[in-house]
Each structure stands twice: as C-alpha cells, then as structure tokens.
Amino acid sequence: MRPLACCLVLVLAAPGLAAPRASSAVARSRTLEQELLGAVRAVDFTPVLDWRRSGQRLATPPNLDVAVIELDAEGRPVAAANVLLSRDYPRGRVVPLEPKRWGTRAVRFTRWDPERWNGKKGWADAGPEEDLVPGRASAPLRFMAPYPASLFKILVAYGVLRMVDQGELTLDTPYHFTSGQEDRGERPVRGWMDPMITESNNGATEALVKLLHERGGMARLNAELAALDLGTLQVNGTSPVTGRGWQPGSIHMTALDTARLFLLIDGGPGLLWKTTRGREVTAATLSEPSRAFLKGLLAEQGFAEGLSSTVICGDPNARPGLPVAVPARFLDAEGRATVGTNVFGRDTRPCNAAAQVEFLHKTGQTENYGSDAGIVRALPGQTPRHYVIALLSTLGYRYYDAGVAPSANFQDEENGFPRVVTGIHFTQTLAELGHRVDEVMKQRGAASAESFPHFDKAP
C-alpha cells in the first residue's frame, strides 16, 4: 500500500433531546456537517511519513470518510453528517445524506485496489465490477474503501450472535477448531469471542470464521447486512478450511455503514433507520442479551490507541485523543498495558484518571491499513455525550510521525518500522482527529444540557 485512505464515522447520543421532526433533524444535521468538516480540515496529514518511501512525506492527500449520527437521550437518531477527504476532495466534501435512513446513495464506493492506489492503474477508471453496491455509477461522489483490517471482526461477532439469536447455537456451545490439519483445541463460543474482540486475536477469529462457514452463517452474513441497507459491509473470500483468507479487495467496510451497525449494537429504542425498501430497522435485530454481551467485550477491548492514545500515556510523541481509560485487565501494578503480545510500557495511570468517556470499540491495523470504531459514552460527572465513531484508513503502521522518525530502519523489513521500537502503532494524526471530534460532541452536549436541564441525567 502507498499513500493513505481513511474513513471515520461517528454517532452521538444527546441525553435530554426529544425525537425530532424531519425539519429539525435537517437543521441539526447542517450544523453538524460544518463542525465535522472543520474537525477534519484542522488535522494536518501532510507531515505524516511513509516507511515504504524511505521516510518521505505522503505523496498525496489521505482519503478520509467521516460520518456522524447524533442521538437523543434514549439513543434515537436526530441528526447526521458525512465528510469525505481524498485526492479527489483535498479540502473535504460533505456527503448528501437521506433523513430517516441516515444513509447515502450519493457515493460510488469501490473495492480496495492497491494498484489503483499506488498508480499502477488509473485512479478514476474503475469498472462496474469494482462497485461495492450496484447502481451508483452516476453517483456524484466516489471513494475507494480501505481494507478494514481487524475491524472486520465486529462483522464476525455480529454473524455469530445472529446465529445465537436464531437458536442455532449458544455462547456456551463448545467448538473444537482445526485449521487444516492443525488442532487448535476446544472452547465454548464465548471463549473464542472474548479474545477476538478484546485482544484482536487472529486465531480466535479464524475459529469463528470457520464456525460460521460450517453452520451456514457466513453464506447468510452479507445478505443479512445488505437487507439492513449496510451493503458496503461484506466478508468475502474467507477459507472454510482454515478460517483465514482475509484479503484487501475482498473484505469491505465503510464508515457510515459501520457507524450504523454500532448504532444497532448500542440499542436505542424505536426506529433507528428505514431501509430503501421500507424495512424499519430496530435494535431488536440483535437480541438484548446478545447486544449486552458484545458491548461488554467492546468495553474490555485493550487497544486504547488509534482514535485515542492512552496506551502511550506520557510519551512526548503522543497527542491527546479520545479521553478514555485502558481496561484494568490489561494493566500491571505500574499501569503499563500489555494486550496480547503487545507491550506498551508506559504508565497509563495519569490518563486513566483523567478519562472523560468510555469507549466500547474495536481497532484494526496492518502495515497498510488502520481502523477504530465503537460507542463513546460520557463517564458520570462529565459533559454528556454519547456517540459512535468509526475510522477506516490506509494509515497502517508504515505511516508515522516525525518524532519517532529516528527509530526507522529502512533496511530491516521485519523490525525496522518505528512501531516495533517505540510501541506507537498509529500516526498521532488519528488520535488528534479523535480528540477534535470529541470536542465537537462535547460542545454540542454542553449546549444541549443548557437547553435541557435533565440532559446529564441517566435515562
């Protein structure tokens, strides 16, 4: 992968707001659009360095897809905004959204193609076979959707929990996993789900992908998501033998659809959105026990990085991000985080003590791609805000900031990336973006609290 493409989405819940009329939703959306556009424009991606280009700056502007859906006190959508930033839209572009759907048909999303990204193919000549959703050839905007990396594990979790809800298995159903000829042992389904979400464990993900194939869930997953108008969320090409086969250009997610999936997981009452075919989507698409289980795992996800920076708390190269705490299960007595095999080595206690929100989320990162998405909720006593934020990008660990540049070794293909030496996995532009978006939502929450005195009361 070459330059970067990122995609971010966010959904805000404002306790105390009443469900809006269509006209007020449009008005709130207009202000949210401009605030979100301003947050994106305020982040300077031009100084980001590229290990694959021997530490040179980015060759082109990054792709950034940001969407926000604001919610009322109980979690009903009241406003939405979506902004694209790319080499096509270097100053950002607001995406037209459809009220009540909180979706868009104004963007032609195409599958990720590394050769198109790095210039070996034409940037603008993708054929209809590359469309993620058909029928958008004449859409006014276009965007090549970055590979979601381990963020796609939320789709695997959704598929498994749909099978649980349909009575095809339970969270305590034992599953013995063999990958080809390799025996990986037996655990209950929940025993595979936990490490897949909280530590982003690939082996656990392989087990659940294979389970979905064996039980017919994988064959249904894309169709079920498409029926919810989440058609850009797709898992294709995985192996029914090993559970692997996770490839760019085959597994797809976009920010707005990712945010709406997290909106569903969050579980507000009543109508969440209406599909183009008139289906009314509610939180009951996933049962309350399944949503509660998944939210519990997301709350315990250990990688407080990407849109936040708590795992590298106190590092001179860290920038403020979403003000979250690292789950205690990953901390030693000195507050240092170890998540799976990732040792971060910083005392996170000062940042944990200063946390303002909890973040129920899933991250993902490879060399070429980085992502982070989840549900943000204000902690007690903090300025009320409640939203979902989703970021999908090509800002993988090959991209880094000037402060860690001395650690880069361009002759060492395995250990020469700055992340190996510093433990700073993401460019801090993403944490800065998380911080700026949270400040927008914090200000909107404070304004709503003034208008509605019960705003900060738990519903």
Residue ranges and their predicted role:
Residues 20-104, 264-459:
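Structured C-terminal helix/loop/strand segments within mature extracytoplasmic catalytic/sensor domains
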Residues 114-146, 335-359:
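Intrinsically disordered, low-complexity acidic Ser/Thr-rich regulatory segments
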Residues 59-64, 68-73, 184-293, 297-301:
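Active-site-adjacent helix/loop patches that line small-molecule binding or acyl-intermediate pockets
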Residues 158-166, 210, 260-267, 435, ...:
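Short glycine/serine- and small hydrophobic-enriched flexible loop segments
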Residues 5-15:
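Bacterial N-terminal signal peptides
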Residues 59-66, 80, 143, 147-152, ...:
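Extracytoplasmic
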Residues 88, 111-130, 215-237:
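Short, charged, amphipathic alpha-helices and their helix-cap/turn boundaries
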Residues 146-175, 389:
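Active-site SXXK
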